[in-house]
Amino acid sequence: MTLKVKGEGLGAQVTGVDPKNLDDITTDEIRDIVYTNKLVVLKDVHPSPREFIKLGRIIGQIVPYYEPMYHHEDHPEIFVSSTEEGQGVPKTGAFWHIDYMFMPEPFAFSMVLPLAVPGHDRGTYFIDLARVWQSLPAAKRDPARGTVSTHDPRRHIKIRPSDVYRPIGEVWDEINRTTPPIKWPTVIRHPKTGQEILYICATGTTKIEDKDGNPVDPEVLQELMAATGQLDPEYQSPFIHTQHYQVGDIILWDNRVLMHRAKHGSAAGTLTTYRLTMLDGLKTPGYAA
């Protein structure tokens, strides 16, 4: 199978993916396309759940989401997001985030399959954090070099149906055990491309410390957040890329370098998506101080 790429960079379109004949796609071929463009849309694929999983396994090691309530009923590898009652978990992703940023190792790839999309203007916003970092003047970059950031997902953890009537302290203790705050270098280096990435997120990154654990002025973090564009309520920052898609497309991106959030459209109706997240086996280094 020969994959054809139309366009360059964020939103490049890939054709030639036959869900019934995936064996000819090599891991290196599809990974290189993603590493190069960062965000690609595999057009008009319409895979079954099994075919979607098979493609994910070609790309990398699939890691199921840690909370079973998000799992597909027959395929736990698949994360289901849906506004249709009983078909998945609603209201996911309506804030800037990096998938699994709160886990011990940054995930390499995220891959989403839309099954139902209400209207033409529903989509996803993306920000290239490597491009942001490259654009910053030295005066903004220097205070972040060699520092460590704390990422805390706890305020976005959803209450599960099984948590109803449980003491809130008990639920909170479980959240702390399962998803405690985690520290990563403020600037990581992509293990494949070598690009430096400003690894921060407005909804998860709570503070920056120097290499000795001393707090860095909170204004440094605030200025970096503003520079990325994720604080722009109108989504007009030049760093924000808007990606639309259609049912049957597959949206695949480099999860180390791109942050994203849902773009809600003007039309009412059901939104249902499947998602896989994968590792690539490459260790993510921090900035070489």
Swiss-Prot record:
2-oxoglutarate binds at H264. Signal peptide: none annotated. Its cofactor is Fe(2+). Fe(2+) binds at H97, D99, H260. GO terms for molecular function: dioxygenase activity; metal ion binding. A (3R)-3-[(carboxymethyl)amino]fatty acid binds at Y65, Y70, G93, Y100, K158, R275. It catalyses: a (3R)-3-[(carboxymethyl)amino]fatty acid + 2 2-oxoglutarate + 2 O2 = a (3R)-3-isocyanyl-fatty acid + 2 succinate + 3 CO2 + 2 H2O; a (3R)-3-[(carboxymethyl)amino]fatty acid + 2-oxoglutarate + O2 = a (3R)-3-{[carboxy(hydroxy)methyl]amino}fatty acid + succinate + CO2; a (3R)-3-{[carboxy(hydroxy)methyl]amino}fatty acid + 2-oxoglutarate + O2 = a (3R)-3-isocyanyl-fatty acid + succinate + 2 CO2 + 2 H2O. Disulfide bonds: none annotated. Its EC number is 1.14.11.78. InterPro entries: TauD-like_sf (IPR042098), TauD/TfdA-like (IPR003819), TfdA_dioxygenase (IPR051178). It holds the Pfam family TauD. The keyword Lipoprotein does not apply. Disruption phenotype: Disruption of this gene attenuates M.tuberculosis growth and survival in untreated mice. Keywords: Dioxygenase, Iron, Metal-binding, Oxidoreductase. Belongs to the TfdA dioxygenase family. Isonitrile formation goes through two consecutive, but distinctive, 2-oxoglutarate-dpendent reactions catalyzed by this enzyme. In the first reaction, an Fe(IV)-oxo species is utilized to generate a (3R)-3-{[carboxy(hydroxy)methyl]amino}fatty acid. Then, its conversion into a (3R)-3-isocyanyl-fatty acid likely proceeds by decarboxylation-assisted desaturation. Involved in the biosynthesis of a unique class of isonitrile lipopeptides (INLPs) that seem to function as virulence factors in M.tuberculosis and to play a role in metal acquisition. Catalyzes the conversion of (3R)-3-[(carboxymethyl)amino]fatty acids to (3R)-3-isocyanyl-fatty acids through an oxidative decarboxylation mechanism, thereby generating the isonitrile group of INLPs. This is (3R)-3-[(carboxymethyl)amino]fatty acid oxygenase/decarboxylase. It comes from Mycobacterium tuberculosis (strain ATCC 25618 / H37Rv).
